[in-house]
């Protein structure tokens, strides 16, 4: 709400308000109220204020009412927007409530001032006043009400827009915070995935190596079996030929027993080879299993070291940021200190320049006073000589007369001859600092005049 006074002052209320100015029969009335309300991120806040003043025929009364109510609630799902900032939000709401109350007090004072002016205007220009002005403003009541309603609606709309902007800003801040948290988690998960991918690649290489070794061992076993079968066939063929020969040569030899013995011998040899191959395979498999377990332990240890190093890196980054902030603050302090000392140095130099100027002026004045004093001294000596000449001319019988003005002294008539001597003693006093620079200088001059006559001696000292 905006009010324009005759003296050019202006009061503005940014919250919804209503006011009316209505002339009555022999009196005046004014009422105003303001209300504001809104919700921020699942919480509510409302305040209501009101005040009024009026006068009736035959008397006047003034009254004001201030009511305020604050209702603060928090609601939300999935943590809400105030999951970790309740204290900050409460502080912000308290600050806003304090600002609203200050605005209300200012509005009450402005309303009281306006009511006093309206009352004075009606007392001065209203019906029954000394000027006898009797105007009927009833035809403007509808226009006033319409404008008042428009002002109320505009103020309410403005307040709603402001609250929506605040809500949108808070929501944007909350989404930004969530985005930053999710981004951090995403980066950590990606780092873990990359580490697991490296471990998976290593395990894949190990598995491929094991498969190659298994294939080579399988081929070797197949080759050994094939060789064994070929040897068995060759031995069986050789044994069969011998049997035929022996049967022809010596039919009394038992070939079945011989074949059984050879079969048992080769079966034992094959069983021994199989056991040796199986033992060698088991040994190789055990060594490979141990190597795989060792590699898994090394990968786990490397993963733990990587996690620890990542934590150390984050800690060092935080320390680096804190050190950078400390460095920036120290640089700002250094710059501020340098600027302060430069300012003080400039002030001291200005004071030194002013003192040097004053010293130069004092020296100039001192030299001028010295020249003036010397001129006056010469005039004085000249006058004394003229006076002595006049005395000698007046007293022709040989008496002498001496007379001096100012600082001089004389003795009458005992001498016809006057011998005078003037001595000027100058003393220079200088003040030096620790570096030997002259801070100030003063000159003291003392003039000693000695007059010799026939019957006496007169000494005269004139300080300067």
UniProtKB/Swiss-Prot annotation:
UniProt keyword terms in alphabetical order: Coiled coil, Cytoplasm, Intermediate filament, Keratin
Pfam families: Filament
Coil 2 as annotated region, ranges: 259-397
Chain positions covered by the region annotation Tail: 398-464
Gene3D superfamilies hit by this protein: 1.20.5.170, Single helix bin, Vasodilator-stimulated phosphoprotein
Chief site of localization: cytoplasm
InterPro entries on file: IF_rod_dom, Keratin_I
Region (Coil 1A) location: 86-121
Region (Disordered) location: 443-464
Protein origin, superkingdom: Eukaryota
Region named Coil 1B: 144-235
Gene Ontology molecular functions: structural molecule activity
Compartments in which it is found: Cytoplasm
Tissue specificity as recorded in UniProt: Strongly expressed in skin and scalp, and weak expression observed in thymus. In the hair follicle, expressed in Henle layer, Huxley layer and in the irs cuticle. Expression extends from the bulb region up to the point of differentiation into the three layers. Also present in the medulla of beard hair (at protein level).
Region entry Linker 12, spans: 236-258
Cellular-component GO terms for this entry: cytoskeleton; cytosol; extracellular exosome; intermediate filament
Region span, Linker 1: 122-143
GO biological process assignments: epithelial cell differentiation; hair follicle morphogenesis; intermediate filament organization
Residues covered by region (Head): 1-85
Domain IF rod: 86-401
Note: There are two types of cytoskeletal and microfibrillar keratin: I (acidic; 40-55 kDa) and II (neutral to basic; 56-70 kDa).
Oligomer and partners: Heterotetramer of two type I and two type II keratins.
Family: Belongs to the intermediate filament family.
Function: Essential for the proper assembly of types I and II keratin protein complexes and the formation of keratin intermediate filaments in the inner root sheath (irs).
UniProt name for this protein: Keratin, type I cytoskeletal 28
Organism, as annotated: Homo sapiens
Gene of this entry: KRT28
């Amino acid at each position: 709400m905006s009010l324009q006074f005759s003296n050019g002052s202006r009061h503005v209320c940014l919250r919804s308000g209503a006011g009316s100015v209505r002339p009555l029969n022999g009196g005046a009335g004014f009422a105003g109220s303001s209300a504001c309300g809104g919700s921020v991120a699942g919480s509510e806040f409302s305040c209501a204020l009101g005040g009024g003043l009026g006068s009736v025929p035959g008397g006047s009364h003034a009254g004001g009412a201030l009511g305020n109510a604050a209702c603060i609630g928090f609601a939300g799902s999935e943590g809400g927007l105030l999951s970790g900032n309740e204290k900050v939000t409460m502080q912000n709401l308290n600050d806003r409530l304090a600002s609203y109350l200050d605005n209300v007090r200012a509005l009450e004072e402005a309303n009281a001032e306006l009511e006093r002016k309206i009352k004075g205007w009606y007392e001065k220009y209203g019906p029954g006043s000394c000027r006898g002005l009797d105007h009927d403003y009833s035809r403007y009541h509808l226009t006033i009400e319409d404008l008042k309603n428009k002002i109320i609606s505009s103020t309410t709309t403005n307040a709603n827009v402001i609250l929506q902007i605040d809500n949108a800003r808070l929501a944007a801040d909350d989404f930004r915070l969530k985005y930053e948290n999710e981004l951090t988690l995403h980066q950590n998960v990606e780092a873990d995935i990359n580490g697991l991918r490296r471990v998976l690649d290593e395990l894949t290489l190990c598995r491929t190596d094991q498969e190659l070794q298994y294939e080579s061992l399988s081929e070797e076993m197949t080759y050994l079996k094939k060789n064994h079968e070929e040897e068995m066939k060759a031995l069986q063929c050789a044994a069969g030929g011998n049997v035929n020969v022996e049967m022809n040569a010596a039919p009394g030899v038992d070939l079945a027993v011989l074949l059984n013995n050879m079969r048992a011998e080769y079966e034992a040899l094959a069983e021994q080879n199989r056991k040796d191959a199986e033992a060698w395979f088991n040994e190789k498999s055990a060594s490979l299993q141990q190597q795989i377990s060792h590699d898994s332990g090394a990968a786990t240890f490397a993963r733990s070291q990587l996690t620890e190093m990542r934590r150390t890196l984050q800690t060092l980054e935080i320390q680096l940021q804190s050190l950078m902030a400390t460095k920036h603050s120290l640089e700002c302090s250094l710059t501020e200190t340098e600027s302060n000392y430069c300012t003080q140095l400039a002030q001291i130099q200005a004071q030194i320049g002013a003192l040097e100027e004053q010293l130069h002026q004092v020296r100039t004045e001192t030299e001028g006073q010295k020249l003036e004093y010397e001129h006056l001294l010469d005039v004085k000596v000249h006058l004394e000589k003229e006076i002595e000449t006049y005395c000698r001319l007046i007293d022709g019988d040989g008496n002498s007369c001496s007379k001096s003005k100012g600082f001089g002294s004389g003795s009458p008539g005992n001498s016809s001859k006057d011998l005078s001597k003037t001595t000027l003693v100058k003393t220079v006093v200088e003040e030096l600092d620790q570096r030997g620079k002259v801070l100030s200088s003063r000159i003291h001059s003392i003039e000693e005049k000695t007059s010799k006559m026939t019957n006496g001696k007169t000494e005269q000292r004139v300080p300067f």
